[in-house]
From Swiss-Prot:
Lineage: superkingdom: Bacteria
Transmembrane segments: none
Family: Belongs to the RbfA family.
Cysteines joined through disulfide linkages: none
Cellular localization per UniProt: Cytoplasm
Keywords associated with the record: Cytoplasm, Ribosome biogenesis
Protein name: Ribosome-binding factor A
Encoding gene (name): rbfA
GO-annotated molecular function: ribosomal small subunit binding
Entry GO CC: cytosol
Gene3D superfamilies for the chain: 3.30.300.20
Function: One of several proteins that assist in the late maturation steps of the functional core of the 30S ribosomal subunit. Associates with free 30S ribosomal subunits (but not with 30S subunits that are part of 70S ribosomes or polysomes). Required for efficient processing of 16S rRNA. May interact with the 5'-terminal helix region of 16S rRNA.
InterPro entries: KH_dom-like_a/b, RbfA, RbfA_dom_sf
Amino acid sequence: MPSYRQARLAEFLRDEIAAIIQRELRDPRLGFVSVTRVEMSPDLRHAKVFVSIYGSHEEQEAALEALQGAAGFIRRLIAPHLHTRHIPELHFKLDRSLEHAEQVARLLRQIQQERQRDESAVESTPESE
């Protein structure tokens, strides 16, 4: 379980990185990127930045590549606002939790439709006496 300091720093980084991506980075590959969460290492030297990217697999890979290329620039913009000994290294990861949630919802809808079909089939069959 992350410490209070890790959680606070992760939340701060999530907000700052999202703002920097939106306002400072002019890369067209970053059009539909959202920072979903940040996980800090116990020593606060590394930050896994999870992002959700709307688009095809190729567009997602291109956006991740652009983010990793801009990691040094983002660190420099964040540095004056951090009161830590070290500025964390940023590691961008694709957050697939939204895709997973969508897949679960789709499966649940499919099960519900199958149940409704089964119930209507049972109701429409004549009862034997």
